[in-house]
Amino acid sequence: MNAMTAFSLNGAAPLANADELEAALRQIGAARYHNLHPFHRLLHGGKLNKGQVQAWALNRYYYQSSIPIKDAVVISRFRDRATRVEWRHRIEDHDGDLSSEGGIERWLKLTEGLGLDSGYVESTQGILPATRFAVDAYVHFVRDRTPLEAIASSLTELFAPNLHEERIAGMLAHYDFVNPEIMSYFKRRLEQAPRDADFALRHVKQHATTPAEREAVCNALIFKTNVLWAQLDALHHAYVDGHIPPGAFVPQGF
C-alpha cells in the first residue's frame, strides 16, 4: 500500500458496513480537507495582497479547467448507462453549453476581475510546476484506478459548500478588488456540489461491499485531499515565502 495515501484513522478496525464507511469519510474530511490549509486562512482572512490572490486564481484555473476532462474519463470507465447519464451533467456544469455559461467561464470572470489576461490564464503557461503535477496526477488517478475509486476521489465535494461560503464572505469583506459578480463561480457551486456529493456518496456506500473496497474508497479520498493540499503548499512556498520558480507567474511589484 502506498504510504502517502494509506488509510489509517487511529488504528481503526476494518470498516464493517456502509455507515462506518461514511463516518470514516467524514472523519477524513474533517482532518484533511484543504479548508485547514494556512494559505486558505490567509486568503479568506484578507491577509494576501492582490498579486497573491491573482496567483491563486491563475493556478486554480488549471484545476478547474481539468475537471471536465477528469469527469469525461470517469464516464469512460462505466458500461452502466445510468451512471454515465448521472455523471454527464458534471461536464456541462463546468464546460457549459451553447446556451449557458459553465464553471470555467465563471472562473475566467474571476481572473479577469482580478486583472489577469484571459489568454494568459487559459494558456496555463504561468502556473506552478507543482500545480500541473498535482492536477495531472488526479486525472491519471481516475484513469488508472478502479471505477469505484474514481468516483470516491470526488468526495471532497462533501466538504466544499462550507469552504465556498467562507470564501465568499471572507473575500468580499476583506478585498476591495473583489465584488459579488466575479465570485459567481462559488455561488453556483453552493447548489451543484451537494447534488454531486450526494450521488457519489450513495454510489460508494452501495458498491463498496467489502472491507478492502471500503478501505480503497477511503484511500481515494485521502489521495484527493493530498492533491488539493499540495497545490496550496506550492502556492504558499512561491507567493508567501517568496520562492517563485523559473517561468511561473510573477505578480506586479513582487
UniProtKB/Swiss-Prot annotation:
Task: Give the keywords, sorted.
Answer: Oxidoreductase, PQQ biosynthesis
Q: What class of enzyme is it?
A: oxidoreductase
- Asked if the Swiss-Prot or TrEMBL record annotates the protein with the keyword Transferase, the reply is no
Disulfide bond sites: none
Instruction: Report which superkingdom the organism of origin falls in.
Output: Bacteria
**One example GO MF annotation:** pyrroloquinoline-quinone synthase activity
InterPro entries documented for this protein: Haem_Oase-like_multi-hlx (IPR016084), PqqC (IPR011845), PqqC-like (IPR039068), Thiaminase-2/PQQC (IPR004305)
Entry-linked Gene3D superfamilies = Heme oxygenase-like
Give the reaction(s) catalysed.
6-(2-amino-2-carboxyethyl)-7,8-dioxo-1,2,3,4,7,8-hexahydroquinoline-2,4-dicarboxylate + 3 O2 = pyrroloquinoline quinone + 2 H2O2 + 2 H2O + H(+)
Q: In which pathway does it act?
A: Cofactor biosynthesis; pyrroloquinoline quinone biosynthesis
Signal peptide limits:
none
A biological process (GO) annotation for this entry? sulfur compound metabolic process
| Alphabetical list of Pfam families matching this protein | TENA_THI-4 (PF03070)
Q: Which Enzyme Commission number(s) are on file for it? A: 1.3.3.11
Q: What function is annotated for this protein?
A: Ring cyclization and eight-electron oxidation of 3a-(2-amino-2-carboxyethyl)-4,5-dioxo-4,5,6,7,8,9-hexahydroquinoline-7,9-dicarboxylic-acid to PQQ.
Q: Which HAMAP family match?
A: PQQ_syn_PqqC
Q: Give the family from UniProt.
A: Belongs to the PqqC family.
**What is the name attached to this protein's record?**
Pyrroloquinoline-quinone synthase
Species of origin reads Rhodopseudomonas palustris (strain ATCC BAA-98 / CGA009)
